[in-house]
UniProtKB/Swiss-Prot annotation:
Biased composition (Low complexity): 782-796, 830-848
Protein name (record): Vacuolar protein-sorting protein BRO1
SMART domains: BRO1 (SM01041)
Family membership noted in the UniProt record: Belongs to the BRO1 family.
Amino acid composition bias (Polar residues), ranges on this chain: 803-817
Tree of life domain: Eukaryota
Pfam family, one: BRO1
Xref: Gene3D superfamilies: alix/aip1 in complex with the ypdl late domain, alix/aip1 like domains
Taxonomic source organism: Yarrowia lipolytica (strain CLIB 122 / E 150)
Length: 867
């Protein structure tokens, strides 16, 4: 395939030119309102400079051309003095030309669009995974673009957009499109030619032969056009006519070969000799094709090889076909073979047409690619005034028709509401068809089935279990702190000032505060648990009933209105359930049965017709509104300058009369249908059987509503309890973590206090021992003065108060930080990292040597704590 070269263009300053035009024609303020549109249009012009050989580049060029065409129709560039510079180069010679004409710009943009389409078609033709139809459509679109250029732009400053050149491009694109169109047919037909041993061999369609002849004819036309252009204008690629000539010869020869095979499939044997003549003719044409000069250039090597192989393969196929056909003719047909020169050419059939430019995209794709008209608001001032008046006329028309439709809908809704339709009609029809009273139906409403599918029984006991565990743990922590406080107090009472450890009450206040907070939380949580349990107990029977699932027969029994009413009824009551409906209408009065059987279908039919009538009316009005809103007569007004505005408006509004007439028809039809429906429904409601069924159905519905409301409340309570249970368990998990941290801190605190007490006791004992040794030394080696002798029968003097140590093993406990459990520190944080102290046995809390026992009755009990 032959792709066309792309042009190059330089930047154009659209922004300044358009802004100046609008400012001079409409005023500077109005020009400022188009700043965004002008900027978008300028970007479009810049984008086409880099448009590629793909669908994106195609869309960019088409979008710019459409917006440029719209702008040109809304301004008079010649009168306004707007003269932007458009610089484009020739696609082959690269000659640059600059002009101010918008037509020059449009012609070059269209050439670029056609060239990109040719490149897309050529690329898709080489892609085996691509549908040949895509390439076919691309070439047809390209042909349409070049046809548009030839029709609209007569004078071209550049050769590649001249009349003769673009018409030649049009023929080339059509030829390539038809070549892609008949590729599949050619492949199937040629495959049949090789099957010479079967009876059905040679059954090839004459249509394929004509299509190939059409391809050859189109390439011949393109060849002649390119040859004439090169001779007259000295312009063009020299390879174009060579390729076109080669394909012309090849497809003409292939058409002759396929046509020859189609003649062999004729019922008359007289055609067999003619078919051999066409085969010989195709061989001559293939020989001519093989001797043609081929294109030059490195980029044509692949084409030349492909062309030689194609012609050689076809020539071999033609020769083998000729050999087998002559053999069959000599043995069987004995038909006279005419000379190839006397045979006429195969009738060409052209199936391709240039796609009009406006049909290149489907409507939805056109809207997507082009987008909104950037300059739709840019119209002449007098047209703006006229369109404003016309818009008021359209609005008045819409309001009038809208009011008519609203009144018609209100009448329909009022009539149906008064008769209770369609609900009463469908319910009555169901009652009569079921053969039993609707009040005894045990169907469970869907909403209750939804409750039953979701509800499960709840177990609230984990709340109490969690609460008890936390309470036990917090009591253990409290007891541990209390025991330490008791021990410290006893040591202080015995050693007095010698026991330098700080009182427990001064350092355990924060821990005790944390314990109280946990206890208070447990009390509050317990109250909430009791409320939750009470709420659940109130709906527990209904919850247990729902939890048994949607197939629970007790649910159906509960909704059985007759079963429920019979339990509370004191005596027998006659209802329609006592009647025999098992035999359908036969159990009723024959006359009444016949009447209902006729009236019910009539009512149903009338109701459906009313529904369809209303839908049709809404659809018509929607279409009518859309038509009115999209109606733009600015072009008509521009072309009708000086005419009577009222006459123009009247003529333009006449196009909406068909919609008005259709709306009127639906309103009239609705009135007749309502009357028929009301008459039939009145007769139905007077029937005694119908009256009884309506009464029983109402009773059943009332009963069902009561039960549904009960289950609704139970379901809502269940959801609240379930949510409360989940939140309660989560609360207890958090509280358990808090209790664990308090317990760890209490244990570390007590261990630290006892270790501190051990150090203090050791210091006291050491000082006492040193003092005794000093006194003994003075007794043995002193001067013997009476002041140094101990008092007869007295106890030794108490040692002095030990000095406060600054190391880690003495003084105030350094391992407990009260701020960690202060009021501003949440429980959820990690407990403070205290210095780890081993837990000594109970009798080793304060060292190996126990302190002197206190006097009194508790002597033995006190000693037991240090052993």
């Amino acid at each position: 395939m032959i792709p066309l070269a792309l042009k190059t263009t330089e930047s154009t300053d659209w922004s300044r030119a358009i802004h100046r035009y609008i400012a001079s024609s409409y005023g500077p303020d109005y020009a400022e309102q188009f700043r965004e549109e002008i900027s978008s249009f300028q970007r479009l012009r810049q984008d086409i400079r880099g448009a590629g050989r793909d669908a994106t580049g195609r869309d960019i060029l088409f979008r710019y051309f459409a917006q440029l065409d719209s702008l040109e129709r809304r301004i008079n560039a010649a009168e306004s003095g707007m003269k932007p510079d458009f610089t484009w180069s020739d696609s082959l010679s690269q000659e640059k030309v600059t002009q101010h004409s918008i037509s020059f710009e449009k012609a070059n943009v269209l050439y670029q669009l056609g060239a990109i389409l040719s490149c897309m078609g050529e690329e898709m033709s080489r892609d085996d995974s691509c549908d040949p139809k895509a390439s076919f459509h691309a070439f047809q679109n390209a042909a349409g673009v070049f046809a548009f250029i030839a029709d609209k732009f007569l004078h071209a400053p550049l050769p590649d957009i001249g009349q003769d050149v673009v018409r030649a491009f049009n023929k080339l694109m059509l030829a390539q499109a038809q070549e892609m169109f008949c590729q599949d047919s050619i492949a199937k037909s040629v495959s049949v030619l090789t099957d010479v041993n079967q009876e059905q061999a040679g059954k090839v369609s004459a249509l394929t032969a004509k299509l190939c002849a059409g391809v050859g004819a189109l390439y011949k036309a393109a060849f002649e056009s390119f040859t004439a252009i090169q001779e007259e204008q000295k312009w063009g690629d020299k390879n174009w006519p060579l390729e076109c000539q080669g394909k012309n010869k090849y497809f003409t020869a292939l058409g002759s070969l396929l046509y020859a095979k189609s003649l062999q499939n004729k019922p008359s044997t007289q055609k067999f000799g003619e078919s051999i003549g066409y085969i010989q003719k195709s061989i001559n044409e293939f020989n001519e094709a093989s001797m043609l000069p081929l294109p030059n250039g490195a980029n044509k090597k692949d084409f030349n090889k492909w062309y030689r192989d194609l012609v050689s393969t076809a020539l071999d196929l033609a020769r083998s076909t000729l050999k087998s056909s002559e053999h069959d003719n000599d043995l069987i047909y004995h038909s006279l073979v005419p000379a190839p020169a006397t045979l006429g050419a195969v009738e060409p059939k052209e199936v391709v047409t240039a796609t009009p430019l406006q049909d290149m995209y489907k409507e939805e794709d056109h809207v997507r690619v082009v987008g909104r008209d950037l300059f739709t608001r840019l119209v002449p001032m007098h047209v703006l005034q006229q369109t404003s008046v016309y818009s008021e006329e359209k609005a008045s028309l819409l309001r009038s028709e809208g009011e008519r439709i609203e009144v018609a809908d209100q009448k329909l809704n009022s009539a149906l509401e008064y008769m209770g339709l369609p609900g009463e009609l469908y319910a009555l029809k169901k009652d009569l068809q079921s053969g039993r009273d609707s009040g005894s139906s045990a169907q469970v409403p869907a909403v209750v089935l939804g409750y039953a599918s979701e509800v499960k029984t709840l177990d609230l006991s984990p709340l109490k279990t969690s609460r008890d565990q936390i309470l036990t743990q917090i009591r253990d922590s409290q007891a541990l702190i209390a025991s330490e406080e008791t021990e410290s107090t006893k040591m202080k009472d015995y050693y007095k000032d010698g026991w330098t450890q700080a009182p427990s009450a001064q350092v355990n206040a924060s821990l005790l505060s944390d314990i109280r907070r946990v206890q208070e939380s447990l009390v509050a949580a317990g109250a909430s648990d009791e409320k939750l349990q009470a709420q659940y107990d109130g709906v527990k029977p209904d919850i247990e009933l729902l939890s048994r699932g949607i197939n629970n027969p007790e649910l159906e029994k509960l909704f059985d209105a007759d079963s429920s009413s019979s339990k509370s009824s004191s005596g027998p009551s006659e209802s329609l359930i006592d009647l025999d409906f098992s035999q359908g209408a036969a159990s009723r009065d024959p006359a009444a049965s016949s009447t209902l059987d006729k009236l019910l279908p009539s009512c149903e039919t009338s109701f459906r017709k009313l529904q369809n009538c209303q839908k049709d009316r809404q659809a018509i009005f929607y279409e009518f509104k859309d038509k009115v809103h999209r109606d733009d007569i600015s072009g008509v007004l521009v072309n009708s300058k000086g005419a009577d505005d009222n006459l123009i408006f009247e003529q333009e509004l006449e196009k909406f009369q068909p919609y008005q007439q259709r709306l009127t028809a639906t309103i009239n039809t609705q009135a007749l249908l309502i009357k028929d429906l009301a008459d039939s429904w009145e007769k139905i409601t007077r029937d005694p059987v119908v009256k009884n069924k309506v009464t029983d159905r109402k009773r059943a519905l009332d009963h069902s509503h009561v039960i549904v409301e009960r289950f609704r409340k139970a379901f809502e309570s269940w959801k609240q309890v379930k949510t409360g249970l989940d939140k309660g368990l989560e609360f207890y998990r958090d509280l358990q973590n808090m209790a664990d941290k308090v317990n760890v801190s209490a244990t570390q605190f007590v261990n630290a206090r006892r270790q501190e007490g051990k150090s203090i006791l050791s210091a006291i004992q050491s000082n006492t021992t040193n003092e005794l040794q000093s006194q003994l030394g003075r007794l043995s080696f002193g001067s013997g003065s009476s002041s140094a002798a101990p008092t007869s029968g007295g106890a030794p003097t108490l040692p002095p108060k030990p000095q406060q140590h600054t190391g880690d093993n003495y003084g105030q406990p350094s391992t407990y930080d009260p701020s960690v459990y202060g009021p501003n520190s949440p429980f959820m944080q990690q407990p403070p990292q205290h210095q780890q102290y081993g837990q000594p046995p109970h009798h080793q809390q304060y060292g190996q040597n126990p302190p002197p026992p206190p006097q009194g009755a508790n002597q033995n009990q006190f000693w037991n704590q240090y052993r």
